[in-house]
């Protein structure tokens, strides 16, 4: 198991788990430092003691063989595996030469000792200095915080305000030092992958120069040496890119820390001071607390961030009520009382600030709720996978393949931003019919067209390969064998929504054509993976862990380009049955409430007129809406999509919680005809390949009419599983346990329509269950 990533957002929480993860990194650095010292010592002995050369080589080889690399993340790339295995390979080479006596290597000190000393002094020692600064700032901040918490509320407001300002300044400084320390630790851990191994490789190369006896051994070693050199260079290149991304994320975190906090399973978490009664008075003990609104469970762990602080035993409280503590009833500020179900006494807690207290009371449904004003950070792009979107991509591809397929640095060279935006505005103009096959004029440069294509893909509401399957694609790229990777990615591609898969097919066919001309344009499959990986598989939140997975995103794109014909022309075997999938989804959906990001976006404004209700047709919530203008085509395409959905792997972690993102444009076979080869277009004459079925989460009886072949839903009752506050006039606000009348699908995917207290409105589908 590798080292856990250190998230910048954890610096602001400063939780016990964060300190433990940080300690594991520090321990690893100490081990590395100690090992480098031993390695240098052994190297000097090797140079100085010609008579004891055999013994020194055995010891040196033994040291190399015992050390194991630990990389950040839960999986390693082929390059990292190669680098991690390199020490064992070096030890094997030295073991074969241990009986041979040779002359001392004159340049061993320059190629081996000096770089390792430089790395240890400049990198590991620098990390230790930053650690000292971090520990010192922790002491200062915690001390000042304790002093601040002991201020009496009876003091003058001016003094209290001044103390608050000083504490805020100290807190910000502490956060900055913490962020810098985390960045430095990450940098040293990454640097050791190449600055540590590269001197060893150079040392061995020097040995081969002087080893006439080891000529054959050196020839056998040359293949691995080449592979390792490439892996080191690839790792170095990735480090440069990763470092800039991490530094950029750190800057964003400094500017707006609250907007980049990591998603948490807890409703609220942070530090609270808990009043504990003693024989002689009371004391306030610092605890790290977490609270889950659904289970009303609060955990408290005594912990102090000061150096040497130990994590206490976890205590669980089943919440009964939360009441704000009156200011005049206690000397401390920011206090509130928590009453537990199984506790005879009331817990008095002190928050770190007034705002913090309001957040805790809101989370625990106290008497002073503060509605969360945080907005969904996911920006909504104007690009869609509709007729216009397919037309734009096809026109760009046609222009590129016609005029610029052999241009060097294709897709690498970026166009002028203003020109790119201008071209996109022209192509996305709704006044221009998407069916018009007008070519992009030759006045537009190829780099502008390629940048426009990439920009349009980035403007989509979600990545082309979807947030839902993003982790699954990354997991597939981490498979050990290439065959397993191809098979898993093949299955995932056929689980994508229909339009996403069609657009991906169109794009990958083009990229394969670009790669076929790599001798002229220098864009190999690997280069194209670097360009399109972060775009097609961009993560839902920007974290250090996501940045570390960029290398696997590139691998996914490389595999699809190299095997695009097999990926899209054949259907993988998926033996999962419908009933298994239904049970798996129901269990996973019932396990926890949907998060904010899982709540569907409102597209239509609901009209409550009886005329519209009579005309409304049911829309299956597990598939895209299909136009009924062409009955055979719509049934065929819907059945194909549902057949793929029914064969999903129920064990996939991405399906544990049904996530409803912004819906794609309505799927109309007439709109997408001509976008792709005829093999991808649904046949208007072929009969349906599967029966019409209801969504697993909301099975409803259907009946057919003479005017429409789509099923008509019968209104039913439904019960709310979780509370929800309306964000639009067309939505309903409700609490857990509320029963709705006349519930049926709405025109918006992911939403139901129901009646509560005489008012009809929209209800998130994954918030309710049918009775």
Curated annotation (Swiss-Prot):
Domain SH3: 713-771
Chain intervals for the UniProt region annotation (Disordered): 575-712
Record InterPro entries: AH/BAR_dom_sf, BAR_dom, GRAF_BAR, GRAF_fam, GRAF_SH3, PH-like_dom_sf, PH_domain, PH_GRAF
Transport as UniProt keyword: no
One GO cellular component term: endosome membrane
Positions of the PH domain: 265-369
Compositionally biased region (Basic and acidic residues): 608-617
Main location: other
MF-aspect GO terms: GTPase activator activity
Keyword Cell cycle found: no
Entry-linked Gene3D superfamilies: Arfaptin homology (AH) domain/BAR domain, Pleckstrin-homology domain (PH domain)/Phosphotyrosine-binding domain (PTB), Rho GTPase activation protein, SH3 Domains
Compositional bias of kind Low complexity: 618-637, 673-683, 691-712
Domain of life the protein comes from: Eukaryota
Span of domain BAR: 7-262
Primary role: GTPase-activating protein for rhoa and cdc42. May be involved in the regulation of neosynthesized protein export through a Rab-endososomal dependent export route.
Designated name of the protein: Rho GTPase-activating protein 26
Organism name: Xenopus laevis
């Amino acid at each position: 198991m590798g080292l856990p990533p250190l998230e910048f957002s954890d610096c602001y929480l400063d939780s016990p788990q964060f300190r433990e993860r940080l300690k594991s990194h520090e321990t690893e650095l100490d081990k590395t430092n100690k090992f480098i010292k031993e390695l240098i010592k052994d190297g000097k002995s090797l140079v100085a003691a010609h008579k004891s050369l055999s013994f020194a080589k055995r010891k040196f080889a033994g040291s190399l063989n015992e050390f194991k690399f630990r990389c950040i993340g839960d999986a390693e790339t082929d390059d990292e595996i190669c680098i991690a295995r390199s020490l064992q390979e070096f030890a094997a080479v030295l073991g074969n030469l241990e009986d041979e006596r040779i002359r001392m290597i004159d340049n061993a000190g320059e190629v081996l000792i000096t770089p390792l000393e430089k790395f240890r002094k400049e990198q590991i020692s620098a990390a230790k200095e930053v650690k000292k600064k971090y520990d010192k700032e922790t002491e200062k901040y915690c001390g000042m915080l304790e002093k601040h918490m002991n201020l009496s509320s009876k003091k003058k407001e001016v003094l209290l305000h001044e103390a608050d300002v000083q504490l805020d300044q100290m807190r910000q400084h502490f956060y900055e030092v913490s962020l810098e320390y985390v960045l430095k630790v990450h940098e040293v851990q990454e640097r050791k992958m190449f600055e540590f191994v590269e001197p060893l490789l150079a040392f061995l190369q020097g040995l081969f120069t002087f080893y006439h006896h080891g000529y054959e051994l050196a020839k056998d070693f040359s293949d691995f040496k080449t592979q390792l050199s490439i892996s080191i260079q690839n790792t170095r290149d990735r480090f440069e890119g990763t470092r800039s991304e991490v530094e950029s994320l750190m800057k964003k975190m400094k500017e707006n820390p609250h907007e980049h906090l990591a998603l948490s399973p807890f409703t609220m978490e942070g530090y609270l001071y808990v009043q504990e009664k003693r024989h002689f008075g009371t004391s306030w003990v610092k605890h790290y607390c977490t609270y889950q609104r659904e289970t009303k469970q609060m955990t408290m762990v005594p912990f102090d961030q000061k150096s040497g602080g130990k994590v206490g035993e976890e205590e669980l409280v089943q919440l009964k009520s939360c009441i704000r503590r009156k200011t005049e009833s206690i000397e401390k500020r920011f206090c509130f009382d928590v009453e537990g179900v199984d506790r005879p006494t009331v817990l008095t807690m002190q928050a770190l600030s007034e705002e913090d207290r309001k957040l805790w009371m809101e989370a625990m449904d106290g008497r002073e709720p503060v509605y969360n004003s945080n907005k969904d950070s996911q920006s909504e792009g104007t690009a869609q996978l509709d007729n216009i979107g397919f037309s734009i991509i096809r026109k760009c591809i046609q222009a590129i393949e016609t005029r610029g397929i052999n241009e060097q640095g294709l897709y690498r060279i970026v166009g002028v931003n203003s020109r790119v935006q201008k071209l996109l505005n022209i192509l996305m103009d709704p006044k221009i019919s998407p069916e018009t096959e007008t070519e992009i004029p030759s006045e537009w440069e190829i780099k502008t067209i390629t940048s426009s294509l990439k920009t349009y893909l980035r403007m989509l509401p979600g990545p082309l390969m979807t947030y839902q399957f993003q982790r699954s694609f990354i997991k597939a790229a981490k498979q050990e064998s290439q065959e397993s990777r191809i098979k898993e990615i093949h299955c995932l591609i056929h689980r994508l929504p229909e339009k996403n898969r069609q657009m991906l097919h169109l794009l990958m066919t083009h990229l394969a054509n670009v790669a076929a001309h790599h001798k002229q344009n220098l864009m190999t499959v690997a280069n194209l993976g670097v360009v399109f990986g972060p775009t097609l598989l961009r993560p839902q939140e920007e974290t250090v862990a996501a940045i570390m997975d960029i290398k696997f995103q590139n691998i996914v794109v490389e595999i699809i380009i190299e095997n695009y014909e097999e990926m899209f022309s054949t259907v993988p075997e998926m033996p999962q049955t419908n009933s298994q999938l239904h049970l798996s989804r129901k269990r996973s959906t019932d396990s926890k409430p949907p998060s904010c990001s899982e709540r569907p976006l409102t597209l239509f404004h609901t009209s409550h007129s009886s005329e519209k209700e009579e005309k409304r047709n049911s829309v299956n919530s597990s598939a895209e809406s299909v136009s009924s203008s062409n009955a055979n085509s719509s049934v065929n395409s819907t059945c194909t999509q549902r057949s793929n959905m029914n064969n999903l792997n129920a064990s996939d972690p991405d399906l544990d919680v049904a996530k409803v993102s912004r819906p794609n444009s309505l799927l109309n076979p007439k709109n997408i005809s001509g976008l792709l080869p005829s093999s991808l277009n649904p046949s208007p004459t072929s009969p349906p390949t599967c029966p019409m079925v209801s969504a697993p989460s909301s099975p409803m009886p259907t009946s057919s009419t003479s005017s429409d072949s789509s099923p008509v839903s019968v209104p039913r009752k439904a019960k709310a599983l979780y509370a929800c506050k309306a964000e639009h006039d067309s939505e309903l606000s409700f609490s857990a346990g509320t029963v709705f009348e006349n519930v049926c699908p709405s025109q918006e995917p992911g939403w139901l329509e129901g009646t509560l207290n005489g008012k009809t409105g929209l209800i998130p589908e994954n918030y309710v269950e049918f009775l």
